[in-house]
C-alpha cells in the first residue's frame, strides 16, 4: 500500500500525544559527538557516520548495548537539558502537543551522575518548552528490569525529593528473563505514593507478560504489548477494559520483533477495539520520530482517515492529564478531523 498525499498531509498535521519515547533514545549521533567533545569522553567510534552505521540491530539487547554507550556522554544538567530541547523541537515540528517522556536514572547514577542532575536537566528543559512552544509534558521514571528490585527501590527513594517533577514510574530494558513479577513490591510502593504505573510488556516477552503487568504490577498502560495478539482472550480483555497500548512500529521492525511493517498487528488490534496509540520509542536509533512512524505505518497497513482520527484521540485519552486539559486536546483533535482535508502543497514542475 501507499498512503495518498492528502491523508499523508493530515497525519503529519494532526495534533498528537507521544506516550512512549525514551529521552535517552532521542540522542542523535551528532549530539553524542558534541557532548563527548564537551565532556572529553572517548567514544569507540571514529565519526558520526561510523556510529550511525553501528545501528544495525539484531534484537533488543544489541540495541541496548549501543544505547547505554551513547548515554555515557550525558554528565551535566546542561547535557540533559540540551538533549531534551532537541527532542522537543522535533516533536513540535511533528505536531506533538503533549508528551509523557521516559527517563532511565539508573543508566546515569551507575556512572556517578547524581539523580538530581538527571531530573533537573530534563525537567528544566520541559518547563522552558512549555513557555516557549506551548508544549505540554510530564516525566515517567523507568526502572531497568535487568537490574534488581532492590536497585529499583533505591532509585525510587533517591528520586522522592524530586517527586513534583515526575508523574509515574515505568519498567524498561531487557524483557527476556525479567518478568513483571520481579518488580511487584516496588510498583506497589509507587502506587502507595500516588504515582501512575506503566510497564513495557509483550515486546520480546510473551502475551502472559502483558496480563502479569496488569494483574501483578497494576499497570495503567502497557508499553508495546504487541504480543497480546497471540492471546485472543487477552485482546478481548484489553478492548473491554480500555487498556491503552503504546505501540512503536518502526522500533518493532528495527529490533526484529516483526520482519516487516506489513506483518505488524496494529491494525488487527485497533479493529478489535484495543486502545492502540502510535509512538517513536527511541527515534534517534530507529530512524523515525512521530510523523515518520505514522507515515510508515499508514504506508504499510490498510489504515484510513478514521483510523488516524482514532489513533490521535486514543493518544490523548490514554494520557495522564487533568480532565479539563484532556478535554481541550480531544476537542482540538475532533475539530481537526471534522474539517475538510487541505490539499498538500503543490510540487513545483521540473525545470
Swiss-Prot record:
Pfam families: A_deaminase. Keywords: Hydrolase, Metal-binding, Nucleotide metabolism, Zinc. The active site is at residue 203. Binds 1 zinc ion per subunit. Its cofactor is Zn(2+). Its EC number is 3.5.4.2. One of its GO terms (cellular component) is cytosol. The keyword Lyase does not apply. GO terms for molecular function: adenine deaminase activity; zinc ion binding. The record marks 224 as: Important for catalytic activity. Zn(2+) binds at residues 20, 22, 200, 281. Substrate binds at residue 282. InterPro entries: A_deaminase_dom, ADE, Ado/ade_deaminase, Metal_Hydrolase. The keyword Thylakoid does not apply. It catalyses: adenine + H2O + H(+) = hypoxanthine + NH4(+). GO terms for biological process: adenine catabolic process; hypoxanthine salvage; nucleotide metabolic process. HAMAP family: Adenine_deaminase (MF_01962). Belongs to the metallo-dependent hydrolases superfamily. Adenosine and AMP deaminases family. Adenine deaminase type 2 subfamily. Catalyzes the hydrolytic deamination of adenine to hypoxanthine. Plays an important role in the purine salvage pathway and in nitrogen catabolism. This is Adenine deaminase. It comes from Cupriavidus taiwanensis (strain DSM 17343 / BCRC 17206 / CCUG 44338 / CIP 107171 / LMG 19424 / R1) (Ralstonia taiwanensis (strain LMG 19424)). The lineage of its organism: Bacteria, Pseudomonadati, Pseudomonadota, Betaproteobacteria, Burkholderiales.
Amino acid at each position: 500500500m501507499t498512503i495518498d498525499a492528502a491523508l499523508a498531509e493530515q497525519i503529519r498535521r494532526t495534533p498528537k500525544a507521544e506516550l512512549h519515547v525514551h529521552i535517552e533514545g532521542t540522542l542523535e549521533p551528532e549530539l553524542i559527538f558534541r557532548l563527548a567533545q564537551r565532556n572529553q569522553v572517548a567514544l569507540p567510534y571514529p565519526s558520526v557516520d561510523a556510529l550511525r552505521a553501528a545501528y544495525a540491530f539484531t534484537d533488543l539487547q544489541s540495541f541496548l548495548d549501543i544505547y547505554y554507550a551513547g548515554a555515557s556522554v550525558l554528565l551535566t544538567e546542561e547535557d540533559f537539558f540540551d538533549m531534551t530541547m532537541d527532542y522537543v523541537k522535533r516533536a513540535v515540528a511533528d505536531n506533538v502537543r503533549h508528551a509523557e517522556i521516559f527517563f532511565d536514572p539508573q543508566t546515569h547514577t551507575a556512572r556517578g551522575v547524581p539523580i538530581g542532575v538527571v531530573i533537573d536537566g530534563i525537567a528544566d528543559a520541559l518547563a522552558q518548552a512549555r513557555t516557549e512552544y506551548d508544549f505540554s509534558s510530564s516525566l515517567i521514571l523507568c526502572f531497568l528490569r535487568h537490574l534488581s528490585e532492590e536497585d529499583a527501590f533505591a532509585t525510587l527513594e533517591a528520586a522522592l525529593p524530586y517527586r513534583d517533577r515526575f508523574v509515574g514510574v515505568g519498567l524498561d530494558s531487557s524483557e527476556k528473563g525479567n518478568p513483571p513479577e520481579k518488580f511487584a513490591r516496588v510498583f506497589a510502593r509507587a502506587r502507595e505514593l500516588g504515582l501512575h504505573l506503566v510497564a513495557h510488556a509483550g515486546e520480546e516477552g510473551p502475551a502472559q507478560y502483558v496480563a502479569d503487568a496488569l494483574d501483578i504490577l497494576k499497570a495503567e498502560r502497557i508499553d508495546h504489548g504487541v504480543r497480546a495478539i497471540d492471546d485472543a482472550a487477552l485482546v478481548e480483555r484489553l478492548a473491554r477494559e480500555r487498556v491503552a497500548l503504546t505501540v512503536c512500529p518502526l522500533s518493532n521492525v528495527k529490533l526484529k520483533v516483526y520482519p516487516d511493517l506489513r506483518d505488524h498487528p496494529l491494525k488487527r488490534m485497533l479493529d478489535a477495539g484495543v486502545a492502540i496509540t502510535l509512538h517513536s520509542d527511541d527515534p534517534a536509533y530507529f530512524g523515525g520520530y512521530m510523523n515518520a512512524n505514522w507515515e510508515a505505518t499508514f504506508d504499510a497497513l490498510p489504515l484510513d482517515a478514521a483510523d488516524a482520527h482514532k489513533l490521535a484521540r486514543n493518544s490523548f485519552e490514554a494520557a495522564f492529564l487533568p480532565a479539563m486539559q484532556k478535554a481541550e486536546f480531544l476537542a482540538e483533535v475532533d475539530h481537526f478531523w471534522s474539517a475538510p482535508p487541505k490539499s498538500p502543497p503543490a510540487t513545483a514542475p521540473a525545470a
